[in-house]
Regions:
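Extracytoplasmic
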Residues: 1-34, 50, 225-230, 351-355
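Extracytoplasmic gate region of multi-pass secondary transporters
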Residues: 19-21, 205-262, 321, 348-356
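Helix-breaking motifs and short loop linkers at transmembrane-helix boundaries and internal kinks
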Residues: 31, 63, 84-90, 118, ...
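Conserved MFS/SLC helix-loop-helix module at the cytosolic interface between two early adjacent transmembrane helices
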Residues: 50-89
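Paired small-residue
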Residues: 74, 78, 89-97, 301-309
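Cytoplasmic helix-loop-helix junction between adjacent transmembrane helices
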Residues: 94-133
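Helix-loop-helix hairpin linking two adjacent transmembrane segments in secondary transporters
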Residues: 129-179
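Juxtamembrane intracellular "pre-TM" segments in multi-pass secondary transporters
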Residues: 178-212, 414-430
Length: 430
């Protein structure tokens, strides 16, 4: 039952990274600037971020099967719209709609899996589902570039759209929300008022914001790197799109191991959250500085090694969710995870357009077949901003609360109550 929703999530992740592969094609087809390409990419993240909370309500209210099938149909329609777009408005609308449909895929796959697998296997299920997403991001690099080379970028979107519609149909016909006779089928859906109240409590908790902001800036760097690494390798190293996409897959390949390994080490070995998050973010900053310092001079093997190292250190992101969950009431764990997860998508959405403008500001007027060719100085400026994002993420991690893998909300609440209690008259508070 979980396989079809997971396959839909796989395609959603392909769409997340696809603009990096087709950036030059979009420039050629529409005369687009770097800022336009960045804004196009961000449309996915804007819709994903804006619809993340309602997506959870829909899944709980209408069932995962129907919601995933509808989301996949919407995502497929958006992909088809991008494939036939003759102007930027339809291209942007299609990208936005793709993100809208993709919003339900991860939550829905977990919901289906949780109903069909024992509770003791949920952590493994979540890790495997996240790994499916990483595999999708890999498929969105070299394999997608190979498909574009054969079918063209429009053909690739049409193929993805049709495949997604087939999966939507299979989901509606074959997937079931619960095993027959399951008690979960009778569980009441959360009310809108209850969800809103929980959201207010989570947002009002000051300990929610450090993991939110750390993920915001970390994913701002990661998202922009995924968007511009293929154009960088094409413009500076004169690689083909297919060759550049092969190198661009390095971070995702590394995350296949680093994400699960980071979670395991945090849970079972060091039994810390803040410490590994801070250390790995510091390592990421060092790698970013090395990457920026060697732009255009490092052999391609060295570029691949640095990108792979970025992916290894980037495994820190998996700690964002437990850090958000463990400082909030256990009954609000779902909302807490959704809120801190929102930080990463907003980080990508709000920065990709402006970073494209940074490239445009340093463009020297050179174009090839209608696509802008940016000089090394432009990429140096853009990737330096990404390094700056990582620095801010590191500083934010210093404000994280160490949970040691346990929910500490009650401890934090008692601490607030103790500080707000007036000291005894004539004495001192301790």
């Amino acid at each position: 039952m979980w396989g079809i929703p997971a396959a839909i999530f796989f395609i959603a992740f392909i769409h997340r990274v696809v603009p990096g592969v087709i950036a030059k094609d979009v420039m050629q087809a529409f005369g687009a600037t770097g800022a336009i390409v960045g804004l196009l990419s961000s449309m996915y993240f804007y819709s994903y971020a804006g619809f993340m909370i309602p997506a959870g309500l829909l899944i709980d209210g209408f069932g995962a099967r129907s919601t995933i099938a509808a989301g996949a149909a919407v995502m497929g329609a958006g992909s088809l719209a991008m494939g036939v777009a003759t102007g930027e408005p339809l291209l942007f609308a299609g990208r936005f709609v793709v993100g809208l449909g993709a919003t339900v895929t991860f939550i829905g796959a977990l919901k289906i899996g949780a109903a069909w697998f024992p509770p003791s296997q949920f952590a493994t299920l979540a890790a495997v589902t996240a790994t499916v997403g990483v595999l999708g991001s890999i498929a969105g690099t070299y394999p997608l570039a190979a498909l574009v080379a054969v079918a063209g970028w429009r053909g690739a979107f049409l193929i993805l759209g049709l495949l997604t519609l087939v999966l939507a149909t299979l989901c509606g016909l074959l997937v079931r929300n619960h095993p027959a006779g399951s008690a979960a089928a009778d569980a009441p859906a959360p009310s809108l008022a209850g969800m809103a109240g929980g959201m207010i409590l989570v947002l009002g908790n000051r300990h929610t914001w450090p993991p939110f902001l750390a993920f915001f800036f970390a994913y701002a760097a990661m998202g922009n790197q995924m968007l511009w690494i293929v154009p960088y390798l094409r413009d500076v190293y004169e690689l083909s799109t297919t060759q550049a996409a092969l190198y661009a897959s390095a971070p995702s390949l590394a995350m296949l191991a680093s994400g699960p390994l980071t979670g395991y080490l945090s849970d079972r070995v060091v039994r810390r959250r803040k410490l590994p998050y801070t250390v790995l973010t510091a390592v990421s900053l060092v790698i970013w500085i090395a990457f920026v310092a060697t732009l255009g001079t490092l052999p391609l093997g060295g570029v691949f090694a640095l990108l792979f190292a970025m992916g290894l250190a980037g495994g820190a992101f998996v700690l964002t969710w437990p850090l958000g969950r463990e400082v909030n009431p256990p009954s609000l764990s779902g909302i807490a995870v959704a809120v801190v997860n929102l930080g990463g998508f907003l980080g990508a959405a709000l920065t990709q357009g402006p970073l494209g403008a940074v490239l445009d500001a340093r463009w020297t007027g050179v174009s090839v077949a209608g696509a802008r060719v940016y000089p090394l100085a432009a990429y140096h400026a853009a990737f330096s901003v990404c390094a700056g994002f990582t620095l801010v993420a590191l500083l934010v991690t210093l404000g994280l609360r160490e949970t040691r893998g346990e929910n500490i909300h009650h401890q934090l609440a008692r601490g607030v109550a103790a500080r707000s209690r007036p000291a005894p008259r004539g004495g001192y508070s301790t």
